[in-house]
Amino acid sequence: MKDVQRIALLFDFYGPLLTERQQELIRAYYLEDHSLAEIADADGVSRQAVHELIRRSEAALQEYEQRLGFVAEHQRRLRLLDELQEALDRADLSAARRALAALRAEA
């Protein structure tokens, strides 16, 4: 997964845990595709200051994922659902049952 996509996904899950300022910067840089210079000019701070806060915000998102693992669990469930769909498409009922059992085991 590309870094931008990964940060966006982490932000979807853990964004509310960041400070308001961190949320604004992640949103501007990753979701709205503003450059560091554009953000710095709009905020009246240096480009380096914006860069540093974005990096700290990324680190916080990574730390939340490392501790909580919600994104990894979400991706695992999506893979199981894909396996289930493929098994059903092939009419492989035993594989479909295994995938369904794996999903149920989580509930």
Swiss-Prot record:
InterPro entries: RNA_pol_sigma_r3/r4-like, UPF0122, UPF0122_fam_protein, WH-like_DNA-bd_sf. It comes from the Bacteria. Pfam families: UPF0122 (PF04297). Might take part in the signal recognition particle (SRP) pathway. This is inferred from the conservation of its genetic proximity to ftsY/ffh. May be a regulatory protein. Belongs to the UPF0122 family. This is UPF0122 protein STH1464. It comes from Symbiobacterium thermophilum (strain DSM 24528 / JCM 14929 / IAM 14863 / T).
